[in-house]
Amino acid sequence: MAIRKYKPTTPGRRGSSVSDFAEITRSTPEKSLVRPLHGRGGRNAHGRITTRHKGGGHKRAYRLIDFRRNDKDGIPAKVAHIEYDPNRTANIALLHYADGEKRYIIAPKGLVQGSPVESGAGADIKPGNNLPLRNIPTGTTIHGVELRPGGGAKMARSAGASIQLLGKEGSYATLRMPSGEIRRVDVRCRASVGEVGNAEQSNINWGKAGRMRWKGKRPTVRGVVMNPVDHPHGGGEGKTSGGRHPVSPWGKPEGRTRKNKASDKMIVRRRRTGKNKR
């Protein structure tokens, strides 16, 4: 993909850019693979806000993506179209299988209309092909990796993301994640060859707040500019620093709040954070 820059005809257009969508070959999705998607505006079943800064945005339909691909082993397919998906940063590819079935997959870099695609232990090491990690050569760039065998692709699914297969030992494979983290997964887990396409998406300049609203993202307001009734940092005469250690709108101290997951024991080396990133 390439990025098209707008001329500064208005303040909102100045500096903004958009994808040229040159890779897209069809504008309407496959009707049999589309499901309705109802926006909840960040509310739960009680109508209370559980996720802030969400709401509005353009109406979307969900495209059913095949993240497992384990029931199509040995059945050849061909890429019929590369399509835009409003629900993710990556593009998607519509596959027509030899048995007549149609399915969507994440479109990797280099996959074009008419490309052959296959899955299974005997598949070639070509972009878009899906096979178990035990059958993928060391050093290969992959995406859409499972965390558990048969669980479906969980890692490296966004635009430009990729994972490197560093090695295999016994029943585990060692992977370098996009964040730099090194972790082990079962060699029976499946992955797709290549890196996810549409890598230039991260370089798009959205230009104005309105384009964020089209995506369903609402403003993020700082607590120190609120009133005391709305936030613990609110109130005070003139500009204040909040007068206390940073807390959430509900008074919980800012910082790490999540417990370790069971899968964390598979991490060999943590990703670099903070000053260690350099």
Curated annotation (Swiss-Prot):
Basic and acidic residues composition bias: residue spans: 253-267
GO cellular component, as recorded: large ribosomal subunit
Family annotation (HAMAP family): Ribosomal_uL2_B (MF_01320_B)
Keyword Ribonucleoprotein: yes
The protein's role, per its UniProt record: One of the primary rRNA binding proteins. Required for association of the 30S and 50S subunits to form the 70S ribosome, for tRNA binding and peptide bond formation. It has been suggested to have peptidyltransferase activity; this is somewhat controversial. Makes several contacts with the 16S rRNA in the 70S ribosome.
Name of protein: Large ribosomal subunit protein uL2
Source organism superkingdom: Bacteria
Region listing for Disordered, in residue ranges: 1-58, 225-278
Family: Belongs to the universal ribosomal protein uL2 family.
Biased segments, Basic residues type: 37-58, 268-278
GO molecular function, one term: rRNA binding
InterPro entries on file: NA-bd_OB-fold, Rib_uL2_dom2, Ribosomal_uL2, Ribosomal_uL2_bac/org-type, Ribosomal_uL2_C, Ribosomal_uL2_CS, Ribosomal_uL2_dom3, Ribosomal_uL2_RNA-bd_dom
One GO term of the biological process aspect: cytoplasmic translation
PANTHER family recorded: LARGE RIBOSOMAL SUBUNIT PROTEIN UL2M (PTHR13691:SF5), RIBOSOMAL PROTEIN L2 (PTHR13691)
Quaternary structure and interacting proteins, as annotated: Part of the 50S ribosomal subunit. Forms a bridge to the 30S subunit in the 70S ribosome.
Classification via PROSITE patterns: RIBOSOMAL_L2
Cross-referenced Pfam families: Ribosomal_L2, Ribosomal_L2_C
Keywords of this entry: Ribonucleoprotein, Ribosomal protein, RNA-binding, rRNA-binding
